[in-house]
Amino acid sequence: MSTEDEKLLKEAKKLPWDERLQHKNWKVRNDANIDLAALCDSITDPKDARLREFGPLFKKTVADSNAPVQEKALDALLAFQRAADADASRYAKEVCDAIVAKCLTGRPKTVEKAQAAFLLWVELEAAEVFLESMEKAVKNKVAKAVVPAIDVMFQALSEFGAKVVPPKKILKMLPELFDHPDQNVRASSKGLTLELCRWIGKEPVKAILFEKMRDTMKKELEAELANVSGIAKPTRKIRSEQEKELEEEVVPEAAGTNNSEEAVPEAPMEIDEYDLVDPVDILTPLEKSGFWDGVKATKWSERRDAVAELTKLASTKKIAPGDFHEICRTLKKLITDVNLAVSVEATQAIGNLAKGLRTHFSGNSRVLLPVLLEKLKEKKPTMTEALSQTLQAMHKSGCITLLDVIEDVRVAVKNKVPLVRSLTLNWVAFCIETSNKATVLKLHKEYVPICMECLNDGTPEVRDASFSVLTAIAKMVGMKPLERSLEKLDDVRKKKLSDMIGSASDTTSGTVAASNTGVGTSAREVMDSSSMRRSAASMLSGKKPVQAVPATKKSGPAKSATAKKTDGGPQSKASAAPVIEDVEPSEMSLEEIEEKLSSVVKSETISQLKSTVWKERLEAISMLKQEVESLTELDKSAELLVRLLCAVPGWSEKNVQVQQQVIEVSTYIASTVNRFPKRCVVLCLLGISERVADIKTRGHAMKCLTAFCEAVGPGFVFERLYKIMKEHKNPKVLSEGILWMVSAVEDFGISNLKLKDTIDFCKDIGLQSSAAATRNATIKLIGVLHKFVGPDIKGFLSDVKPALLSTLDAEYEKNPFEGTASAPKRTVRAADAVSSASSGTSDGLPREDISAKITPTLLKNLGSPDWKLRLESIDAVSKIVEEAHKRIQPTGTVELFTALRARLYDSNKNLVMATLSTIGGLASAMGPAVEKSSKGILADVLKCLGDNKKHMRECTLTALDLWVAAAQLDKMVPYITVTLGDQKTGSEGRKDLFDWLSKHASNMSDPSEALPLLKPSASSLMDKSSEVRKAAESFMNEILKICGQDVVAKNLKDLPSPTLAIVAERLKLSTVHEGFSDSVKMVTTSMSLPSKAGSKNNKHGPNDRGSNVSKAVSQRGIPARSSVTMISSQDSIQSQALFNIKDSNKEERERRVLVRKFKFEEPRREQIDELKIELFRHFREDVSLRLWNSDFKRQIDGIELLQKALPSSRKEVIELLDILLRWFVLRFCESNTTCLLKVLDFLPELFDVLKDQSYMLTEAEAAIFLPCLMEKSGHNIEKVREKMGELIKQMVNIYSLPKLLPYILEGLRSKNNRTRIECVDIIGYFMDHHGTEVSGLLKNLPSVAALTAERDGEIRKAALNTLATAYKNLGDDVWRYVGKLSDAQRSMLDDRFKWKAREMDKRREGRPGDARAALRRSVRENGSDIAEQSGEAVSRSMAGSMISRENFGYSDAHMVPRQMATATPGPADWREALDIVALGLPEQSVEGMKVICHELTQAVDPESSVLDDLIKEADRLVSCLAVMVPKTFNFSLSGASSRSCKYVLNTLMQTFQIKRLAHAVKEGTLDNLITELLLWLLDERVPLMDDGSQLLKALNVLMLKILDNAERTSSFVVLINLLRPLDPSRWPSPTPPESLAVKNQKFSDLVVKCLIKLTKVLQSTIYEVDLDRILQSIHIYLQELGMEEIRRRAGADDKPLRMVKTVLHELVKLRGTAIKGHLSMVPIDAEPQPIILAYIDLNLQTLAAARMLTPSGTMGQTHWGDAGSNNPNPSTHSTDAQLKQELAAVFKKIGDKQTCTIGLYELYRITQLYPKVDIFAQLQNASEAFRTYIRDGLAQVEKNAAAGRTPSSLPLSTPPPIAPIPSPKFAPSPVHTKSINNKTDCNEDDAGGDTHPFRGQGEIDNRLQTTNLQTDRYQSSGTLDALRERMKSIQAAAVGANFDGVQARPLPSMNGNTLHGGTRLDADPQTQNIIPPMDERALSGLQARMERLKSGSMEPL
């Protein structure tokens, strides 16, 4: 720079900024901009005043005409923007306009800086200004200026997101840009559109832009949109957000938390398309269209067209608001138009208006809604669909909310048309699902009652819709709002609702999980992609940018340094994610390279490499090669050496020899080093690829490329070569490069390649090349790929020209698929090379994710009622698979398979075939993963083989071929096995399946795959179709080849013998013949015996199934034996037993029977074969031969043999009853009447034997016999019918009537009219003889009444007779049970009932229904007698005896006699119901319990006064129900329904839920009830009953409710009483002696659990219980045991004893010494002493020791008061306070009439021992009457003591006056006690019922044993001396029991279930609060205080 310039610049610096920046000299302006930039960079405060000064300057500086100055001005602007804050945005408009005008056409660097400035303006919150400037920029005529403008909008949107950069303005700009003449502008606009799709979604962009776009552009964009995935996330924030984030990050950074980058990504922003479009005025064009005239036209078509015009205009996205009231009034009329088309059009118009106007349409929507809801009654699908869509649109658009339309909905759901009700509720469900949680929380209170009411609707659709609404509410806000309402639902509806809610929540959770995953991934993608600055055009496919070099340059050194550190130091096993290698080489000058290589390569060598003389260069490269080969640590210098070779001589070297040497050195380095950097490959690859094109260097270059592949993997090398070869101008580079790729694939295989990229490269570049050499090389490459990949590669090349396809096919033949056999010849050294592989599939071909294409619309259309739509959807699925090149991922296909499964059952067979083809294509495209995704659809595919159309079966087999190619045959075997055994498959289907299996059997190399198919195949050898037998035999031979004879024989041994014989014969299995058992030989013999007779008889008896089997089997080659041999041995056979039950496994046989199957089905062939085997196995041979003979006479002989043996073989007959019944069924199915009559003679005798044995048929036996008996009861011979009818009537003796009824009802559905008549008659018989209510016959009357409409007169007559019988029993009540009848039927019935009444009157039988009413009246009048009589009757009719149980173990004082039927005042219904329950009949009592439950429900109402009346009856009710518990359970166990059990438990539950009723239950009743409940809880038969698990649960819950609400004192007393061993007679069933002890133990465990529950809450309920009664019950329990038994049990760890001690311990702990005041019911002066007293004293001592309260003297002292009597000490005041409290407690006892005697006695003792103590000083505030009472009482006690009488037997004649002590200060406060006592949980172990006693309790036991307490050592305890002696003895024992140990031992802590050892006392201050406060601290009661007073340490009060 010249001196003048320097001087000028120096002078200019003195000028103001504006002058400097506008100076005429460009250097001055340039210098000023530089200074300004530096100054702005130095400013740290955004509010600096200088920034305001600089802001206006930039509008001129950035428009400088000098390019360098302009660039510096932009630098200054950027510095200013970085320093300023959002206030600077005021300058944005002028500056942006200037930049748009001058900077966008400048140098590339200038453009880049201008774009950066724009982005900073956006950051400074001037996005609107920025977009306004862009609107001007894109209108620039110069395309060069438009592209940067589009790019900067793209970058702004990409970085800041749609929230900061409004998309609306950008969308307005785009249509013009799509038609721009410049292709770069069009490409950039496409990229910007794609970015918009990422932010606001594809659909809004399509809707707004596509209509304004040319078709070609549309097509291009459609293709690009397919690549847009994921959801965008902003990567940059505006300035204010940055500042806020900085403030928020200060605290986390200080605390050392994670960076903000690791925060959870925000949810993607949702942008409404509605906000993006401009409103359109439709009112003006509507006026012009003639709408108003059209809607008034008389022609319906004109009205429709007028409304259609409105619909069309309103279909715009956003409608401008206006006055639409008149339009809506018109539409309201048109909705109800008589013409459906007009009505539909009007409805659609309303929907469009709602969508376009949104909230502006809310008022009109409210007016229209009632009409729309009313119109839902229209049944036409078009109308219904239009209404549904309109209603949904009104809600979604916000026109109406459910809160606003409650009344409209309420009216609609009461509409008389069910369709209106159901569709309204469906709409409500939709609205709730699309509302937010806050809205639903507001409205649920209104809608839940509506839904609950609709659940009782008579129409199923309405109920289902109501369930949907409740499900939607629960899904949105949880179950809590529904809980109250759900209590009113029955169990079935509750279960249905919970199932619906569960399935809905599962679906929701699955969807949420999936969506979350997607968001996470996309966010990560966005972060990765936004790290580089991109152009808009880079969004287009094929133009995606390479990794940005600037970014990698920065991170390069850091990453390499990290890598070096990692290599040097030891790596941990659980290392972090591997560091991604930087593959882009950074720039490095030759000087740097020389400097770094100075220690490795000589400087002369490098100098010579630079020489211009080729010989010197050749010599230098040779020297370099030697030096490199001599290096020992080549790894460190590898990259530098490669860089050196690339620089000198470089790849532009012209000399071939030098070139070859350079390539050789590179090859050596690549193949020698341990880790060859990918950067080196990138540096060399372009040069090497060019050398491949040269024939002189080709060999060396190819070898070098191969070495690169070994070093870094072929995937990386191929990926880099694609781009080089594609863009290179020399065609040889492409052709020869592809040829090298051929050799590379052969060497390395395909495991490291991205096959999709390779195939795309071949298809798009290689095959499209104009050079033949390139095309041929590409064909070779594809051929080699085929060798590794297989035929699947063809799917990716299907769109190639036909000529090329034929050439490719020829190449495929040269390179056949080798699969796993084609192992690679070379291996890759790099560990991370495998990561380049595209997918984890075995063939390496990529699979496409098609889940996005499986749209809800597609799935919906698959189930459309329109068959064309269904077919289109199936074809669409096939098209999706084709587009994915028949390679798909299983993601998202589960729902697709579910939808396709439904189409396999389509009524349109063509659709089924199309579905089969599609399923096959899906399986083939998905590969092995189809097995998991298809959800068992294969079973449904195989069912299509049952179709009789051959074409259908062929389609199925084709689908199976494709399936087996995808998933192995072994995965299909389970489905095929089921299909082969299914008779519905049909013979043709089974034959085709066997042929198919034979074809594919060769693929089963593993024998275990074929074994499951053996048995169904063997069974098919006996199929009636010869084609099936032939195909099965062929397949069996294939299995034989695969598995071998031994394996087949071993797996067939358990087949039925006839089948086994056939298999052995057909397959020539010698091993099977050898392995035949004797029974099989016997069967073959028996089958061959009657062959001749069978063939003769067959002409006369074609229905003899047994003979058919015998004949068929014998004809198939089973060797026959001579009948003579068999007959000659008959004498020896006769001596054998008739039955063989040794190996009978009846349970196993019954398990195979399908129970609960009431309909009769003909016996199948395999069932007959199985019966034959069982018959020969378990019956004597001669009997079996007779029974299984084709001659009916022989069969009759067999029956006679059974008849004779019946009386003596009852046990055996019962064991084999199921076999006999199956044989009888076979006889019923035959036409031989003689044999049938013989069977019918034998069966009554058999049933009589069963009845005598009290045997009841099992479910399986009934399922075998009864369906056939009912079906055949309509026999065409009258005599047979009569016998069968008698047999059915006899069945009730061995099978309960309720269980028999379903079979009879099934008979009513028979196709045989005679059967139906017989079944109706039988129902009538049972009604007449067993009553209508006993067995639930009333439920079946509707079925009988329905038969009165039959054509057949006999059926009508029978039905009328049966109903007349019902009328006789029920009277007019019968009409309640007959169901809905037509008028004609009612008239017919009415006539018959009148006739019946007349007949009854003639016979003097009274009026219909009188007997029933009389029974009820007699129940009320003398319930006890009737109860007794009916109870006896029922007990006789039941199989299980009902054992009455007695109360025991209660003293007379507390036993309450039970009076069953005493009439007490109460509601009439209640008393009548109680009388019915008292009868004791389980079935009838249900009706009574219903009434009781209803009354109890009413009683809960707080306004009701019923409860007071019911309380008087509570004890009687519970007493009756307690008696009903065993009766109902025994009744249910005898085979009846468990209904009555449920009602009893439910009634008890409702009773005990009301606390006042529970408290009114007396102790004796409670004892009986608890005993019954616990016994049934333990009964092992209960779980086996119907609903057994529910009953057990109900018993448990009921017990808990009783413990919660019953009177607690009674509960304690009852449970302690039940701890004694239970009387054996009280168990529900006879108990073996050896198990009685075990049962008692279990019973005690349950009682203990109940006591634990009561004891746990004792601290809070201590003031609710009568402690005197509880202590009395404990006393009785301990006294009954005795001291010796207590010691023995303590050693045996007896739970009941421990529990009693625990209860006592808790009571002592909670009440302290005051517990002694509750011994009024314990004879404390009895001789010997009660055991409980010793336990109380020792508990007090233990608790005091735990609290560390020790006597005032030394440990050796035996009482309290000997030490320090005259020494005043701090404890004196506390002692005074204790004495005051003790006296207060005594006075309190005296004030209570229950304890006044004991109180006076204690007070008397104090006065006798310590006469100086003035007890009346405490009574200054008491009344004179109370003081007088005490004086008189003391005198009376003194008198009694002199006479030697105990106080417990001497109650005072006068009760004490009330409230002797008004001040509460001396009495312990219950509130205070609760607050200061630490809350302790009782020890409990729920699992085993085990109780761990308190630790202190164990110490008491030990002390009692060490003290060797002998109660008889004391003299009379009636004297004070005796009491004193006893107290001293106990204290001495306590002192001798090591108090140190007591103090040191930790106190236990309870945690609810298990007792754990506690902490030391000094460690846990809370445990020290267990002992009550001062008033209850003394250790040995009154004695301690007496001693203290005596010693004079306390002054008299």
UniProtKB/Swiss-Prot annotation:
Compartments (UniProt record): Cytoplasm, Cytoskeleton
Record organism: Oryza sativa subsp. japonica (Rice)
Highest taxon in the source lineage: Eukaryota
Name under which the protein is recorded: Protein MOR1
Biased composition (Basic and acidic residues): 1400-1410
SUPFAM superfamilies: ARM repeat
Gene of this entry: MOR1
BP term (GO), one: establishment or maintenance of microtubule cytoskeleton polarity
GO cellular component: cytoplasm; kinetochore; microtubule; spindle pole
Disordered: annotated span: 236-264, 501-576, 1087-1115, 1400-1436, 1755-1776
Family that this chain belongs to: Belongs to the TOG/XMAP215 family.
Listed Polar residues bias regions: 504-520, 1764-1776
HEAT repeat positions: 48-86, 164-202, 321-359, 362-400, 441-479, 848-886, 890-928, 931-969, 1007-1045, 1233-1259, 1260-1294, 1295-1332, 1334-1372, 1539-1579
Chief subcellular location: cytoplasm
Alphabetized Gene3D superfamilies for the sequence: Leucine-rich Repeat Variant
Molecular function, one GO term: microtubule binding
InterPro entries for the chain: ARM-like, ARM-type_fold, CLASP_N_dom, HEAT_type_2, TOG, XMAP215, XMAP215_CLASP_TOG
Role: Microtubule-associated protein that is essential for cortical microtubules organization and function.
Keyword Isomerase: no
Keyword list, A-Z: Cytoplasm, Cytoskeleton, Microtubule, Repeat
Residues that span the membrane, as ranges: none
A family per Pfam: XMAP215_CLASP_TOG
Ranges of Low complexity composition bias in the record: 529-539
